[in-house]
């Protein structure tokens, strides 16, 4: 079977970050008395479902550690590897850090797909690592029923510049660095609904490196940061609000969207992860039309950064975004928490 004739997405039951275990089920899996062990040097663990773990070395520098892997979200092997690696490295940038090394995680159905195709996947991952300025230093592989690829990434960050998802403040403005709709467009492609003019759009967005995160972290007024991935904008914004004890007001019309996304939602191109996300986070949002809900719960793979920014830092953040060629979009604000109101209010 040639590399050009395969459709990798046919070999997996899920796609990209949409194959994540639902937040509700994950809560059950992670619940453990042993998890309450506290290391005073562990600045960020899994308490707030942040993007990565952070360990203070005690010398002004902290180590960031993360891993992320998934099944194919696109058919092209090289692009699959590149997207998976970009997505994994993003967690380091979302914490305000600089990646220094990565190792690969590969599961491959040896009896179904050739090793040459796996090599192309790995080369895509290596390409993304080079873009981030790091080496793909090794890895581990297993014979698996479905193709899986990703990275474990190590990074460093000045301890005082660590950006968490739980330190936002009322009064912060909310900004996104990438449009939503990745899950919808990739599902539309899988269902042969994607229009020719929309081919490749999701792949291009997923391959954009969130490298600006380290520069955003140097701005004092950036109070919190996370990347929007498998739990959708609603899930990751809800976690930001819960961690900080605030509520969000979001302007739906202001949210950047990939072309055609609302049309594809109406055609039923909604990934399975959308329903799982709504089941976990839907109770935190107010009433809204089904198509709005489906976009906010759309699982993003290698999505953009979500920033909570104090008003006085807005211009500096915009200037920094422009330096990286980012179309930064203001989508709402954070307000003091009040009982009886939805945690995420869509206007």
UniProtKB/Swiss-Prot annotation:
- Report residues binding Mg(2+): 51, 91, 227
Site positions for Important for catalytic activity, renumbered to this chain?
A: 20
Q: Does the keyword Transcription regulation apply?
A: no
Q: Which GO terms describe its biological process?
A: selenocysteine biosynthetic process
Known catalytic reactions? hydrogenselenide + ATP + H2O = selenophosphate + AMP + phosphate + 2 H(+)
Q: Which UniProt keywords apply?
A: ATP-binding, Kinase, Magnesium, Metal-binding, Nucleotide-binding, Selenium, Transferase
Does the record carry Electron transport as a key word?
no
Cofactors that this protein relies on: Mg(2+)
The record ties this protein, via InterPro entries, to: PurM-like_C_dom, PurM-like_C_sf, PurM-like_N, PurM-like_N_sf, SelD_I, SPS/SelD
Q: Tell me the residue numbers annotated for binding ATP.
A: 20, 48-50, 68, 91, 139-141
User: What cellular component GO annotations does this protein have?
Assistant: cytoplasm
The record describes how the cofactor is bound as: Binds 1 Mg(2+) ion per monomer.
Q: What is its EC number?
A: 2.7.9.3
MF terms per GO, please?
A: ATP binding; magnesium ion binding; selenide, water dikinase activity
Known Pfam families for this protein? AIRS (PF00586), AIRS_C (PF02769)
Which top-level enzyme class is recorded in the Swiss-Prot or TrEMBL entry?
transferase
Active site positions, chain numbering: 17
- Functional summary from the UniProt entry: Synthesizes selenophosphate from selenide and ATP.
User: What does the record note on quaternary structure?
Assistant: Homodimer.
Annotated family? Belongs to the selenophosphate synthase 1 family. Class I subfamily.
Q: What is this protein called?
A: Selenide, water dikinase
